[in-house]
């Protein structure tokens, strides 16, 4: 066994703040080294008992709110703070593997999953880690050509020395305003990814952030200059917002020097993410769509703008709003939504934004919202679960929320 070094400095004492999946991966990795003491702070009460000055390094889980007491104290020790991805980078930086980081408010999970899928389909060894669910250090023993990392703004705030071969930002819209003072601060946290990337680009055509690439969307298809490359109907994906996701993937692969025509053949096989604008069933002429992964206002706007050209959506909206600005969706509600059923912990908060702009009803929970929506829906209409909120008031996560929705649709079909 060997001692643990970080930036050529021997580390003998480390504090792990937070012990979720990320914290556990750090501790499991450090168990391979000698001469290092790792202390674990699992809650507020434990944290205040540690002398932060006594540690060589402090690793912080992304879920720890640095803007709130008692964790504000960590801001005085910025030089000591490292993320799990910094540690991962220290141990792979001398290999030939390429690292790609993707952040954004909406679409990043689809982009990283599609990128990883295409790389594997082209015959490369690729790993997919980060905010998508698998901590990077869990993959440290694997051999790979490419490492695709989904990063959140919280993770970027913790970066110390990581250098990605390529970083990109997509579709920044207001989110996590319970953790940031305003949208500008949140947006800047995303843009800080550039500081940790050797190559970098932004694709966010909706917010006026410059995109200088060669790909355009014209009438449901992707063009490069004047050459048509791919039509949405040639893919297994639903909604034109996925053309934007494909453009980001093509830009990534372009910058990695890979063959775009071969990549497009792989993209045609990609089935998309669970719980992201997925048609569940058509029951009694009504189409039920699961977009449980729509956990912020921007994601729900993207869904509304992509799935129909008519005012025929019955929308299930609600959960934990995270300070979201629901006035931003009023234009899309007016254009595409027939009725809204609002449920969850922040239903009155959401109501305060959309009251007077659409027909709606408050519900006790998602199940009641679904039952009322299915009763109201007519043939050729759409019942859309796109909550624009986090799910932890009622569910363990967006995946469980989506599964419950799918089960409710299945039960409805059995009764029909």
UniProtKB/Swiss-Prot annotation:
Catalytic activity: UDP-N-acetyl-alpha-D-muramoyl-L-alanine + D-glutamate + ATP = UDP-N-acetyl-alpha-D-muramoyl-L-alanyl-D-glutamate + ADP + phosphate + H(+)
Membrane-spanning parts: none
Binding site for ATP: 104-110
E.C. no: 6.3.2.9
Reported function: Cell wall formation. Catalyzes the addition of glutamate to the nucleotide precursor UDP-N-acetylmuramoyl-L-alanine (UMA).
NCBIfam families assigned to the protein according to its UniProt record, in alphabetical order: murD (TIGR01087)
The name this protein goes by in its record: UDP-N-acetylmuramoylalanine--D-glutamate ligase
Organism: Francisella tularensis subsp. tularensis (strain WY96-3418)
Lineage per the UniProt record: Bacteria, Pseudomonadati, Pseudomonadota, Gammaproteobacteria, Thiotrichales
